[in-house]
C-alpha cells in the first residue's frame, strides 16, 4: 500500500540537506508519497491540509522549536500516528520516550526506510484476504 508520509522537522536544522535530499535519494518516493512541507511543491498549501492528507507523520525533534511543537499538536488533534526521531547529539534527547535515535543523516534515512518497510509489510498482512487475526483462543 502506498503511504502518504508527512515529514515534520524544525527549521533550525539544514532540513534540505539533512532530511529532504537524503530521503529523496533513498527512493522512498517510488513506493510512497513524501509530503515535504517546506518544499516548493507544498509552499502554498496550509500545513493542516497536508497533515489531513497524510497517513503517518515522521517527526525529527532535533533542535525543536515552538513551530514544530505547534505542528505536533495539530497532528495529534487530527489523530495522526507520529513516529519520533532525534539526533543522538541533541541535548534534549533524554526528554523523550519511544523515540528513534540516529547518529547521522544516513542512519536517519535507513531507520525511516526500515520503519516504512515494516509498516508496509504489516499493511499487506492485514489486508491479505481481509482476514484479521487478533489473537489465539486457548480452549482447554
What do the predicted segments below correspond to?
Residues 1-140:
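Conserved catalytic or regulatory cores that recognize and/or transform ribose-phosphate-containing ligands
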Amino acid at each position: 500500500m502506498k503511504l502518504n508520509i508527512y515529514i515534520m522537522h524544525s527549521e533550525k536544522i539544514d532540513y534540505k540537506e539533512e532530511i529532504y535530499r537524503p530521503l529523496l535519494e533513498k527512493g522512498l518516493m517510488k513506493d510512497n508519497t513524501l509530503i515535504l512541507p517546506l518544499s516548493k511543491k507544498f509552499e502554498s498549501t496550509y500545513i493542516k491540509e497536508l497533515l489531513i492528507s497524510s497517513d503517518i507523520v515522521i517527526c525529527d525533534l532535533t533542535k525543536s522549536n515552538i513551530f514544530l511543537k505547534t505542528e505536533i499538536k495539530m497532528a495529534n488533534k487530527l489523530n495522526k500516528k507520529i513516529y519520533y526521531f532525534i539526533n543522538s547529539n541533541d541535548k534534549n534527547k533524554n526528554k523523550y520516550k519511544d523515540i528513534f535515535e540516529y547518529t547521522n543523516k544516513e542512519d536517519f534515512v535507513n531507520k525511516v526506510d526500515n520503519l516504512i518497510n515494516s509498516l508496509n509489510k504489516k499493511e499487506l498482512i492485514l489486508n491479505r484476504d481481509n482476514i484479521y487475526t487478533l489473537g489465539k483462543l486457548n480452549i482447554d
